[in-house]
């Protein structure tokens, strides 16, 4: 039994083209079915807060994944790194970057909507400090994780609280 990671940042086809994922949603669906049939665990990587993405759209992605036989999920915020097309686009026309409080609230909602049996492998990420343009607050990963834990406890949020599958 081993793991395979499939990138699945969004359901919106415009985002898939923008980030150059290179394949449509149906390819992801087929790969999940084939991997599961082969006895391979599927861990999905979701990037939150793509340019123009709303929280409702992010939750639709979570709901979609809940309907798939995935075993694990990695959630993280979009990072803008120096030398990338995304950095160029951001410099030309800055788009919304959430502050830590907004991200934590969104992560709380994602966790509440996530199927209880899906293993959470990641709640945040930290881009290379020398390349990270935004969001700068992600560099304090331990602080972010502590704040997420405190928020979940204070708001009485647990995985699957809002899942009605």
Task: Indicate where each model-derived feature is located.
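Conserved strand-turn element in the central/C-terminal portion of the radical SAM core barrel
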Residues: 12, 35-56, 77-82, 89-97, ...
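A contiguous catalytic/ligand-binding core that recognizes phosphate-bearing ligands
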Residues: 17-28
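Catalytic cores of alpha/beta
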Residues: 51-67
